[in-house]
């Protein structure tokens, strides 16, 4: 077979692997041969450049078939042309535990043209369609089977809930206009507006009556800061003045214009809207903090408390805000306690659980219930790798931390782990230099881990393939299940020597910035281990009399850390040694930190409560960053200490 022929894509790979079955007894000792490593290294490098002919040619030279199947998987999930519906569906059936199943199913649906109805109907009974085309094809099948009511309901749901191009909108409307109702157009328009899809919403305006159209035009004006916004809002009929979407966009418009008093006036009277609780929650979080900064804690509390969220990060943040404001600004510990208990009860992750428990302890202590407070502090301190657990550990009377030994998998468990197909494939991909492709397979394995030993084996696998970022990720996953893998979760790579910044702090920041992935590049352009922006790095390099090289930020670990160490040292100097301020400045920039000091005071002074100052940071990313770095710092000091160790977070906050 000529795998390099014109038009070859995943079809060739499927042919090569057809009929090959991986023996379940292959052990860890069975590694890729030198020749296979060379062949697959070239194949995956070619695939990364979308040169599928070269990828097939190189892969055909290898003897071990499993990485070739991964190459086939990559071609399908990348949307490479050529794979038939039958090929893709067979791959899905044969690899049900492989990652990115939705992408595989999407590829199958995109290849369904010409597939017989009976074949598709059989497939859809086990795999509900996920694409617009797939759902509409299923609706047509239902219509042909006499299931018109169900078919029409599905068509309407697709119209209302799908993000469509202008071409697809016209096509669907022309084909199903007799099924779609005015009410469906109104629901679609409302969804598009809530999702800020301006262009799509404008296209739908002619399809809705005058009242909803006036509301939509006003909302679009508010979203886009149109010059005639007041006029558009004024043209909304009185019967639509209480439209939740219109009120939401008016609040958001005022907030974006820094018209905070006006935004607060609307927000405090906003009606309950559980359907769009997530959007409202964002405004409530922002405006509650602004109200607090304006010296209006009573308003801030009302805004935070009256949310419609029932779970998730927004629920946790608003319950915390309501409790914190009640405790620290309104002197209402009983009210605060109820919110903190709700936060604790809803928590599923160590940080949230520790946060709820610590602050419930603070509220109980304020109420005079010392034993209850101590119990809550004990509960928080059990999550000793978290910021709030470490704060709780310094509370008077808290039970000393007891470290539990790390899991030690037996040889039986190790051998069973090594026999797993995805474990072997992860090793093979790493050996072939396919690091980007390793990640989804590793994460899929993590999804299946349920025991301490399995989490430990995943962390060891990451270390074996020299992926400290995945080792940290495995340890974090373990912590969510109550398993602490300290050595694995807090790697200690060799760092360049230098003064000014303690090694535990440097490690703590690097763990948070990149999880030790030296080639990491953020969406904003920050690069390398310490996620340095090129402009900042160039200034530091000049000050150190080093030649600046953007490439070296992601290829030379020592170079990146040398510059990062110098930068954090400068920040510490500029902020008189304050860890809180320097860490915040590393994330958000010194100028913003100085702005926050003007708003919330100087946390280095005795008159400012530094714990409250950290909670007051208006940027969630920076607030989280400061807390995560400080908690990492304690664990790295623990790892590097040669004598007895006690958490010093409370004093680190004040330094």
What do the PLM-derived regions correspond to, one by one?
Residues 54, 83, 87, 100-103, ...:
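Alpha-helical positions within canonical tetratricopeptide repeat
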Residues 65, 73-74, 89-90, 94, ...:
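Catalytic glycan-binding domains that act on GlcNAc-containing polysaccharides
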Residues 30-33, 56-66, 77-80, 89-99, ...:
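Solenoid-like repeat scaffolds
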Residues 12-24:
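Bacterial N-terminal signal peptides
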Residues 39, 67-68, 72-75, 105-108, ...:
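TPR repeat positional signature
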Residues 46, 79, 112, 142, ...:
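Residue at a conserved register position within TPR or TPR-like alpha-solenoid repeats
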Residues 49, 78, 82, 115, ...:
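Structural motif corresponding to the intra-repeat A-B loop/turn of tetratricopeptide repeats
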Residues 29-74, 402-422, 431:
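N-terminal leader/linker segments that initiate helical-solenoid repeat arrays
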